[in-house]
Structure formats: C-alpha cells, structure tokens
Amino acid sequence: MAAATIRNNKTDMVKVREDYAMTGDGQVDIEGWVNQIASQTHLDDADQFRLACEKAAEIDLQAFRQDRQWAPGSSSFRIGIEMAQVLAELHLDQASLVAAILYRAVREERVPLETIRKEFGDEVAGLINGVQQMAAISSIHHPLKGNVLGQSEGQLDNVR
C-alpha cells in the first residue's frame, strides 16, 4: 500500500504500511494474511477472521464478474483488508478488524447488514452500522458531490 505525497510540486509515492501476502497469480493470500495479522495482534477466533476475509473476497469477485465495482479497477476486499491492517497496527480487537473487512460489502449494498449480524454477530454489525451513521452525519454537515465513506441517500434519510 502506498500513499501519494506532494513535494516541490512533484508527486511521490511513499509506503505507509507493510504489504499483505499475495499468491503467485496476484491474489491476496488470505491464509498468509491471517497469519500476518495474528502475529501483530491477538485474534480470538482465527477461523471467524478467515471466514470474514473469504466472504469479502467472494463478494468482491461477484461484483467484478457483474461489472458492478464501486470504481473502475477497485477492490472493496483489498481496501477492507488495508483498513483492517491499520486497525491491527493500532491493536484493535477482532470485531473491529472483521467490521473493517466487511464494511465495504455492506456499504455497497452487496450484503445486508442483517446477514452480517447473523454470520458474525451483533458487535460486528453494530460497528459497521456505527461507521455508516458517522459517514451520514459527516455528509449532512459537510455536503459533497460524492459520498463520504460510501453512504447512500437512504442512509442519510435514516440518520435525519
């Protein structure tokens, strides 16, 4: 993962965190990445964590196959694991990491929040819902042409 910085009117790429494990064909090595995260922070249930990664990856693949990505060339799964990587470096708990991995799938309305609640529990669903509410509040106070954290108009109406 790299972030752009501007120095003397020139854009440079700066590495901001360690890359995640990849397979030979350029896909995320979920097992390797789970092990990498487990070496950085405590995972209460590595199987649940792995399942969240697999679910997010499958949802992302379906979006790609249906040409329904949120932006050309984007991967909601990879962005989700990058967010989870940041949270792992901050030593947040597993529920927070799982919520980060799954957030974009819910935000992009590829999976209902209720499905996440059933499969991953109230805490994960509550965290995702809370982030959606914060994004909606931010949008109300600072309206932009684009979405903030991907909230939809319906989410804004719910907060109002």
Protein language model regions, located:
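Active-site helical microenvironments for divalent-metal-assisted chemistry
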Residues: 1-160
